[in-house]
Regions:
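A conserved beta-strand-loop-helix scaffold within acyl/acetyltransferase catalytic domains
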Residues: 3-31, 37-51, 55-159
C-alpha cells in the first residue's frame, strides 16, 4: 500500500486533537488571505505587482472570465503543463476534471488569439480559494499575475 492519511486545511484545534490521539503533526503552509473589498493596486505594498500587470497588458494578453466552453482547449493546456511539470498530484493544487471545475470561477488568458493559461477558484459562501493554475510554455511573462488579479477584481464585484 505505502499510503498514509493526510489532513488538509486543518485548524489548530483539530491538530491538537489529532496530537492527543498520537498523530504526527507537521505544518506545511499558511493560506494567503486577500480581502477583495479592500484590494487596491495603488497601495505601496503592491508596487511590484503594478509593473507585472502593465507587462501583461503590453504583451497583448486578454483575460476572459465569462462562461467557459472551450474545455478541450483547457484540457490541452493542462496536458502541456503536466508534460513540462510532471503529473498533477491533486494535493494543494487541484487536478483538471471538467465535472469538478465546472463549479469553479475560471479565468482564461488569450495571447494572439490562442488560450495560453487559466486559473480556477472554488467559490464558497464567504471566500474564493485558488485551486488550479495551468499554462503553456508560450505564455508571456506576468500572465498568471493578470489572471489572479482578474479573479480578485471579479470577487470584489460579486461582493
Amino acid at each position: 500500500m505505502g499510503k498514509i492519511p493526510l489532513v488538509y486545511k486543518c485548524n489548530s484545534r483539530n491538530a491538537a486533537a489529532m496530537r492527543r490521539h498520537h498523530w504526527s503533526i507537521m505544518h506545511m503552509s499558511d493560506d494567503a488571505m486577500i480581502a477583495p473589498q479592500h484590494f487596491a493596486l495603488n497601495t505601496p505594498a503592491l508596487r511590484t505587482l503594478r509593473p507585472k500587470l502593465r507587462a501583461a497588458t503590453k504583451s497583448g494578453i486578454v483575460i476572459h472570465t465569462d462562461e467557459i466552453t472551450e474545455w478541450p482547449t483547457l484540457h490541452q493546456i493542462d496536458q502541456d503543463w503536466q508534460n513540462t511539470h510532471g503529473a498533477a498530484r491533486g494535493g494543494t493544487i487541484g487536478r483538471f476534471e471538467i465535472g469538478y471545475l465546472s463549479t469553479h470561477f475560471i479565468a482564461c488568458a488569450e495571447h494572439h488569439g490562442r488560450q495560453c493559461a487559466f486559473v480556477t477558484f472554488q467559490k464558497r459562501r464567504n471566500e474564493w480559494c485558488l485551486d488550479v493554475m495551468r499554462h503553456t510554455s508560450e505564455m508571456p511573462d506576468s500572465t498568471m499575475h493578470a489572471l489572479v488579479h482578474s479573479a480578485i477584481t471579479a470577487a470584489k464585484e460579486q461582493g
